[in-house]
Structures are given as C-alpha cells and as structure tokens.
C-alpha cells in the first residue's frame, strides 16, 4: 500500500524537479540568501533592545532609539536590497542562454531594479526625500516585480541588440555604459508608468496595492488548512528526493518575513504576536532538526534500537542534525524513499505546526518576532525567536515528546528489519570500515583494518599531484560543509594537494572560476544541467551525488579523495 502511494508521488517528480529549477523561483530564493547577512545582523539589535523587557528591565527611550537605528537602517530597507539581489540572480540565469560576448550587465540590472522599486514603493515626503514605510518587508512582493520586469526588459534589448553601439576605439567600460542606457531607460519608463496608473486609479503606491491584493491570501495561509498544506509540502517533496524548500520557500518568502515584522510591531504595541507563518516557524517548528522534524531521530537511533548499524548511524548523525543539517540521517538511515518512515516523516512537521498554532491561539504564546540563523538548534531557536517566554520552554519539550511518540512505532518496525538482515549475514570488512568511518576518523579506520591484517585499497597513495580546489554546493551551505570538511581533513592526513570549500547554490556564480571541480550535494543535484552550462564554459569539472553516496563520502575522507580523483580520470 505504502509502496504504491510512494510510486504515485514519484510520478510527479520530473514536474516538481523542473519547478524547483524555475529561474524566477530560484531568483527569489537566491535573492533572499544574498540578503541574509542584513536580516540576521538586524535581528541582533532587536534581541538586545527587547529581550530585557521579559525580565522587567526596559531601556530608556533614548537608548532604545540608539539600539533600533541599526535595525531600521538595515531591515527597514530589506526590500530595496532584495530588488537588487533578485535581479542579479535572475540576470545570471538569463546570461546562461546568451552568447558569452553579448551578456547582460548584472550591475546595471541591479541598479535599474532598485531605482524602479523606489518608484513603486516609496512616497514623497513633505519636506523632501521619500518615505520608507514600504521599503522593508512590506515591499518584498514589489521588489520581486521590479526585479523581474527589469531583467526581462534587459534580456529583450540585449538579445535583439537594441542598444547604443559605440565605435571599437571606445574603451569597453565606456561602451558598456551606452549599451546599458536604452534598457535602463526602458525599465524606468515602464515602472514609472505603472506607478502613475496605480496612483491615479487607486490613490496608493504599487507596493501598498499589492499588499492589499494579497492580504486575503496571507490570512488564509495562516489558517489550519493553509499551514497544513504549506508545511506538509516541505516534507512530502523531500521524501521523494526533491528539495522541498526550493519549491515552497520562494512562494511564501514574502509572507514569512512580513509576518516577522508584523509580530514585532504587535509586541512593541503591547499586543499579542499571533502571525503563524514566519521564518522561525519554518526553521524551528516544522523543520525541527531538519526537514521531517528529525531532531529526535538520531537520538532514537542511538538509544532505542538494537541494530548495530542503526546505532552507528545515530551516532554519526546526531551532531549535524542538532544544528539543522539532517542529510546524514535522511540518506544514512535512510528516511527518504523509505516506506516505513513515510507517515512519520510527513506527519511530524504537520503535527508540530498544529501544536505551535494551538499554543499561540489558545494559550496566548507569542509567535516568532526575530529572525535567527537556520543552524540554531531547534529548542534554542524556539525560545529565542519567541522572546524567552515560559510557554516557549514548554513548547520545545512538548515537540520533543510528541515527535518521539510519532516516530517510535515506525522506528521499531525498521529496526526489526535491519536486525533480521544483520543476523542473516556476516559482517564484511567493508562493513567494518564503514562503521568505524562513521565516526569521521579515516586514519583510525585504516589503523584498525591494518591491525586486523585486512588489505585496504583506500589507503593507496592518491594520484592527485597538482593543487586541486573543490567547491561543494548544497541549498544553504550546511550540508556541503560535511563533505568539504571530510575532504580537507583527509587531504591533510594523506598529504594530498586538495582544498575544499562549502557554498550555497545560487551564491556560487562569482566564485566558481577559482575551482577545478564542483560537486553538487543531493539537495541541488537536479540543477546539474543548468550549472553544467557554466562549468563547461569555464572548463571546470562537475559532479553530482546521490543521497547514500554523499553520506558515505562525508564519513570516509579517503573515499572522498578517490571520488575527486575519479572526476579527472573520466
């Protein structure tokens, strides 16, 4: 029954993989990633300014204004900045389809998108200048609109050579200025015209009009059915091997960050912060320890199973999963595409958000009002993100208990299956090494096997003799760090000239030329054909990995070095 259900879901995999590679969704996601330092930096000052209130201490008005200035001058302009970063990401995608000698200037598209955004989102101030009410999270949807219109217009002009052409004697930097003039002017004229039409028709700017238009959708998304569909999709997509956040996050990004600010303003006014769909809800409630709400799963594998294999997987996965990097348990157990874990993997995140919604709406707990790094451990993220309230401590404990209850019966079934397999066969030398290597100590693995008189082909000298720089890419930079660290550690142990770095897909365009090999983690393997256009143009090797294969490489540094070597032998 479960196998048939999974088979039906997998039939839609090609469509959803294509959707996850959509250049507009990708531009939104990458635009936010580029702006993340601003978002996280501003949250530090929110915590300093308002967390003391919980303990009865309040800053005076002057000090509060000093602490809030960095927030207002960064997060208060986030939509303005995202207009530029989104335009840059979309420009990179369009440039892949253009000749290398006729590319869109991303600096110009960023400038045009940001200038165009000001027309759509800002109102003139009485004393000169302009107002910034819609330049923060309220203007995010308008930022996307400005970025998309800008790059589409530039692509139209550049592709058809609708530009001012200068004589060959003119220096390239001067020639580029005139080449950008027509598309830049066209963008500003189009967006200014849109601004005039909306202002004269509805007596508001475009940003305010878009916000009113989507307000019913935002309200519906915050309801029981809305949160179930949205956050259930995260786990459902990941279960069949599709990186769910690549599809879902861009669709809800504007809501999540707008709700964070709305909750903060409610708290400032002494009211109840009740917006459910926020970035904190996604990172610390729904993906409590990673997609599938897997924070408790490695501990359960360690302490509640009898299988040696499962205990080893739990030990190897517990630390990264605690910080939200749960690929070791997803692909090591595995949880994804494993019929036994389908129900808890999809159900646990949904139940978590239901419980959170109950705490907020019935018990009066405040929702998230601060943005935190996604690698913050789940329980700590809940407590800090909701203002250190008493209910936040109760909620964190409740989610841990409930998730254990949800996963436990399915874990026992799976553990029984693995026990039967272990009892039916003898452990091979390769199994022994894999378990020792699961502790991330390749040198120790080699010494144990050598002491046992076991030949070890993995310890052979590497054929890599020249300096090789490797870039490992995943969705956000966390999972890629596992393999990059394993490569660097093994390279140092075996004196191999390999240096590896971790990065997030989408933020790689400007640095990839510094590397000889790029490895795609399973999260972003579906983007292989897209990035191959760039690597082929630059003469860089490209490799993609599957789930179990990737986890094995992160645990066995020598195997990871061999994998790198194989890419240059093919």
Swiss-Prot record:
It is an enzyme of class 2 (transferase). Keywords: Cell membrane, Kinase, Membrane, Phosphoprotein, Phosphotransferase system, Sugar transport, Transferase, Transmembrane, Transmembrane helix, Transport. It is found in: Cell membrane. One of its GO terms (molecular function) is protein-N(PI)-phosphohistidine-lactose phosphotransferase system transporter activity. It comes from Staphylococcus aureus. Residues 467-570 form the PTS EIIB type-3 domain. The active site is at 474 (phosphocysteine intermediate). CDD domains: PTS_IIB_lactose. One of its GO terms (biological process) is phosphoenolpyruvate-dependent sugar phosphotransferase system. It is a multi-pass membrane protein. SUPFAM superfamilies: PTS system IIB component-like (SSF52794). Induction: Induced by lactose, galactose and galactose-6-P. Repressed by glucose. This is PTS system lactose-specific EIICB component. Disulfide bonds: none annotated.
